[in-house]
Structures are given as structure tokens and as C-alpha cells.
Amino acid sequence: MANLTGKVALITGAGGKHGVGRAIALKLGEQGASVIVNDIVSQPYPDRSAESEGLPQVVRELCALGTGGIAAVADITDAAQVQELVDKGVEEFGQIDILVANAGSRPGKDRLPVVDLDEEAWDLVQKTNVKGTFLCCRAVARHMVERDEGGKIIIISSVAGKMGIPRYAAYCASKFALIGLTQSLAHELAPNRINVNAICPGLVDTERVDHMAAALTDPGETPEDRRTRMIGETASTTPLGRVAQGADIADVASFLASGESDYLTGISISVSGGMWMG
């Protein structure tokens, strides 16, 4: 088990009840890291489970583990807010050793064939997934370079960043871009002992699947039916026979955040149960 005692992690997009960001935050907290959890809102979105209290709940869970945790609301597509986010983390804990750039766009009007895709929907996906990740990486990398103690940057891409999928053109393009960003940053930051790697999940059973199901529902089909069908079809075509849980992604993130990954940089690890083996 990795030991992250004394390390400080910033995780974006960590406010969901069953989300990947929350799972990673708690995993790193279990391993001793102090964690800054970020989302665009403090409380859950209206359609999220009433059982979730967003960032405050994640912080309470981190504190229950005996590690430090703070919440920081910020829009990652705004450079000034991103800088304030990083500054808040450094002010509270003195440093940031690990960035997990997890925040991404919610599925919606972008889930259409290219010929029907609205320019505004395209731009929103690129702004959130690509620009937002770039701004977070830039701000944290500047801090890490200045501090000169190395660091770990983990970018959450997707298997959709390795293969095209019908009706996912905007999303695929953004996730392909993140793999390119990962590799470029890995080259640039290697002299500073900063490792930069990407995780490429397949379908993960989180609130995001609810949004995807609502966006992809066929005529005569309810979002709940579509969700069940998506989970079932994906599991049946995945060699390991199931879709991912947030913990599956968190386990890989904890490895990449630790010293055990010191000789890895610029790689994109598919965490898809064998759905994608490239």
C-alpha cells in the first residue's frame, strides 16, 4: 500500500456522491495525504442524490480518516479562479505534491452525430475538458517547478481518448487532446522530477452514467431503462465482465501518486476491464 503521509493532493471534480473524484480523494486520504477537493459548486447539483452533500461531505469523510481536507469551489475554466484554488491549497497546507485533474463536462447536447452537433455544445466540452485541465496543470506545474521538490500530475482522460465512438465526437476529441497534453507535459516537466500520466477509464458506474443515459435515450425508452441497458451491454462486452467502479480508478491513481511510479511518465493507462487493451 502506498504511503502518502506528508503529501498534499488537489483533486478537481470531487463533489459527486459516487464520483471518481470522491473515490480518489478518499483513497489518497486513506494513504495519509492531505486533500484539497474541488468542484464548481459546493452542494450537489439538483439532480444528484439527496444523500450527497457535495464537497462538505467529502471533507467530513476525509477528516474521519484522520487526514486533512478542505473544500475549494472554483470554475476550472477560469484562469483567475484556478490560481486562487492553487493559492488556497498552498496557503492551507504549504505545498501541492499531487494534482488529479478529474473535472470534466457533463454529458448533454454534445451526444449527437457530427452533422447534428451544435457549435456551442462542441465548445463547452472543449472548454471544460481541455482548457480546464490545461489551466489546472499549468497553475500546479508552476508551483511544483518553483518549489523544486518534484510532483505527480494525473490527468483523467478516457478510453474515448484512444478510439472514436459514434455520437461522442466532441468528447472523444477532448479526451484525445488530454493524452497529447499528458505527453507534452511529461517531456517538459521531466527535468523537474514531475511525473505526468493519464488514466483512461472505460464506463464507470457513477452519476455520470445517469447524465449519459438521459442524453442518449431512444424514443420510447426511459433514462432508467437506457442506463440499465448501457451497464448491461458494456459489462457483456468487457472481458472482465463488469463496468468499473470509482474504486478501480482510485486504485490506479493512488499508484501514480506514489513513489512507486517514479519511473513512469507520459503513459496513458486504460482502466477498462479489457475493453481497450491498447
Label the model's feature ranges.
Residues S49-P56, Q83, S105-D123, E146, ...:
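Conserved mid-core segment of classical short-chain dehydrogenase/reductases
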Residues S158:
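Residue(s) in the substrate-gating loop at a strand-loop-helix junction
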Residues R111, M163, S236, L240-R242, ...:
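Short C-terminal tail/terminal secondary-structure segment
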Residues S52, A72-L85, E119, G246-D248:
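The beta1-alpha1 cofactor-binding region of Rossmann-like NAD(H)/NADP(H)-dependent oxidoreductases
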Residues C137, S174, T182:
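Active-site helix of classical SDR
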Residues V115-F134, I154, L178:
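Catalytic Tyr-X3-Lys loop
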Residues R142, E146, H187-P191, D262:
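Alpha-helical segment proximal to the catalytic Tyr-Lys
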Residues A2-V37:
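Canonical Rossmann dinucleotide-binding motif of NAD(H)/NADP(H)-dependent dehydrogenases/reductases
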